[in-house]
Design a protein with these regions (language model features):
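DG-centered beta-turn motif at the end of beta-strands
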Residues: 29-32, 43, 68, 106, ...
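Von Willebrand factor
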Residues: 86-125, 139-140, 158-172, 183-194
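Solvent-exposed loop/turn segments at secondary-structure junctions
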Residues: 31, 73-76, 135-138, 165-168
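Mixed-charge (Asp/Glu-Lys/Arg
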Residues: 32, 50, 137, 141-150
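An active-site-proximal "capping" alpha-helix that borders the catalytic cofactor pocket
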Residues: 43-56
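Short beta-strand-loop
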Residues: 62-90, 169-175
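Acidic, polar low-complexity linker/tail segments
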Residues: 1-26, 31-41, 55, 114-119
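P/S/T/G-enriched low-complexity
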Residues: 10-19, 61, 122, 147-157, ...
Length: 225
């Protein structure tokens, strides 16, 4: 296990102390060499804003759980946990872009967490998966894309793909059912404020309730399509 990995409390203690329904959010983050410099600096700052915004929301701080899988190489940087124990890792740019393997690793991590919820009698909202990349995959990705499409069709999770400048939007379109979003400039902080607000709204709803989200692809928003 990497020294940067963070593990939540085990043995169901976390659920005994906090039996609130959970809203899991999985971040799949490109840490390949092309993200070096300002892109990764802004992404790191955005994740810290995300943590701070969630911490300031009483309900979200109890219900939203965050996990991070970085690629490449593929590594679980933070296991699912609520924001009171979530200390964002500082991402470093190395390697290539094994996006397919990262997606499959993330889906397996999410499945494990859902099993833990069920085993401990914890209700949970439909999970959110956010993929952020500035390039194209350097590994086999079609199996991962198929898993995302089938998972979304079965309502196992909601999948969002965000392309930074240089991203292969044509490939991102193969993942899931939503049109991928293109990040304007390097507005990661705006993205994560939107994400925290959206998850905050979800966490205040009933588990099976549909929540209307603010469209991020408006002229004033952080994304374009």
């Amino acid at each position: 296990m990497s020294s940067t990995q963070q593990l939540p409390f085990g043995g169901g203690v976390e659920f005994a102390d906090n039996p609130e329904p959970r809203c899991p959010c999985l971040l799949l983050l490109d840490t390949s060499g092309s993200m070096r410099g300002q892109p990764l600096n802004e992404l790191n700052a955005g994740i810290r804003v995300f943590r701070d915004e969630l911490s300031a929301d009483l309900m979200a701080s109890k219900r939203v759980e965050v996990a991070i899988v970085g690629f490449g190489p593929v590594q679980v940087l933070s296991e699912f946990q609520t924001v009171d124990t979530f200390n964002p890792p500082t991402l470093a740019a190395t390697g290539d872009t094994p996006m397919g393997a990262a997606v499959e690793e993330g889906l397996a991590l999410l499945d494990q967490r859902k099993q833990a919820y069920r085993a401990n009698g914890i209700a949970f909202y439909r999970p959110w998966i956010f993929l952020i990349t500035d390039g194209g995959p350097t590994d086999a990705w079609m199996n991962a894309a198929a898993k995302v499409k089938s998972g979304e069709a079965a309502k196992h999770f909601s999948f969002f793909a965000v392309g930074v400048e240089g991203a292969r939007m044509d490939i991102l379109r193969q993942f899931g059912t939503r049109e991928p979003l293109k990040l304007k400039e390097l507005r990661f902080r705006d993205l994560f404020v939107w994400l925290s607000n959206s998850l905050g709204s979800v966490s205040k709803s009933k588990v099976d309730e549909t929540v209307d989200l603010v469209n991020p692809a408006t002229p004033q928003g952080w994304a374009s399509v």
